[in-house]
Design a protein with these regions (language model features):
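Surface-exposed beta-strand/loop patches in extracellular or lumenal glycoproteins
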Residues: 30-32
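Short, conserved acidic/polar surface loops in the N-terminal third of protein domains
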Residues: 67-68, 108-112
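DPxDG-like acidic metal-binding loop motif
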Residues: 110-134
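Glycine-rich active-site/cofactor-binding loop and its immediate structural neighborhood
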Residues: 293-295
């Protein structure tokens, strides 16, 4: 018997980084707004009759084996730490073979690692019979990722992977709540273009730099996040009203403030893309995730979408054939 699952990646619209504790506690009604895309992280878990552990990432072309879970735990270094730490936590009684594959380009900033951890944690949850609820799976996955990265991680990335669709993640003193937004996937599909700049980035480093600046009392960063928090709430209301002109404007404003937080969030190519697509009819653009390269989201009216796409290709970036993923983590045959 094998257990196979997949979970979608996400594109963040507004409010990112505020989902890292304790930053959201410093703002009134903090929220992040995002949507799931049909770029998937997949995993297959094969139980074994012996104690052997086999871990394989097909997109990274890495495979490693251990005689047992105890040997894995004792290993001074592993090449696939997300897989190893998740397996350590769920601790199956027998050996397993885990094969994963991510469709997200390297360093894309669309939470490929978070989607992978949700898919893998769901499969291991089923294998071991723990029967954890989705919110508990989110907590486990988030803590495993922080343990591997050794920097704080936010919560928003896991919700699109769990539930799909367009959503707001409310960040409150009494907990985190996921709220679906009634936006038809086709309505957003006709208005967004996702480009990959081919520049890997490290979200942990960029997010940590921003977070440290905030907590150290950097007034400019704190002011930027006051504005970003306000924009995220306005973005939510614009989506509820299906006001796409305002949504594009807010996306542009979000990026204007975000790019000022720390050096390295933007790049010359990203700046060229944002400028060129604006002239081609894009209503807004921002980097996905923490920045420093990776993917850039562009919003546009449907009649300008092809022009925007062409300009992106001419500038040397890649357009990813992404659509809204209406469904979150699911089982594969």
């Amino acid at each position: 018997m094998q257990i196979a699952s997949k979970a979608p990646c996400r594109v963040d619209l507004a409010g990112g980084t505020l989902d890292i504790w304790p930053l959201y506690l410093f703002h009134s009604q903090p929220v992040t707004v995002n949507f799931a895309v049909d770029i998937y992280a997949k995993c297959v878990v094969h139980p074994r009759a012996d104690a052997r552990i086999v871990l394989e990432s097909r997109d990274l072309n890495v495979k490693e084996e251990f005689a047992s879970l105890d040997e894995l735990r004792a290993a001074p270094q592993v090449r696939l730490p997300l897989l190893a730490r998740a397996l350590e936590y769920f601790s199956p009684e027998h050996g397993v073979e885990i094969v994963t594959e991510s469709e997200a380009p390297a360093g894309a900033g669309i939470s490929g690692s978070s989607a992978l951890l949700i898919a893998l944690s769901m499969a291991l949850n089923k294998l071991t019979g723990h029967n954890y609820k989705l919110e508990k799976i989110r907590e486990i996955a988030q803590n495993i990722e922080a343990r591997v990265l050794r920097v704080p991680t936010g919560s928003q990335d896991y919700y699109p992977a769990m539930y799909g669709g367009v959503s707001a993640v409310e960040l409150n003193v009494d907990g985190i709540r996921w709220q679906p937004l009634p936006v038809e996937p086709a309505e957003l599909d006709a208005r967004f273009v996702l480009a990959y700049t081919g520049e890997p980035r490290n979200s942990g480093i960029n997010n940590w730099g921003v977070m440290k600046a905030y907590l150290d009392g950097n007034a400019a960063v704190q002011r930027n996040f006051d504005l970003i928090a306000s924009i995220a709430n306005e973005m939510r209301h614009a989506l509820l009203k299906h006001d796409w002109a305002e949504t594009g404007h807010l996306l542009r404003e979000e990026w204007t403030h975000r790019r000022e937080n720390v050096p390295g969030i933007t790049t010359p190519l990203i700046d060229r893309l944002v400028c060129a697509t604006r002239h081609a009819g894009a209503t807004g653009a921002k980097v996905c995730g923490a920045g420093g390269g990776g993917c850039v989201l562009f919003l546009t009216e449907p009649d300008a979408r092809e022009r925007v796409r062409d300009v992106i290709l001419q500038a040397g970036a890649t357009v990813l054939p992404a659509r809204v993923a209406a469904r979150g983590v699911s089982w594969l045959p």
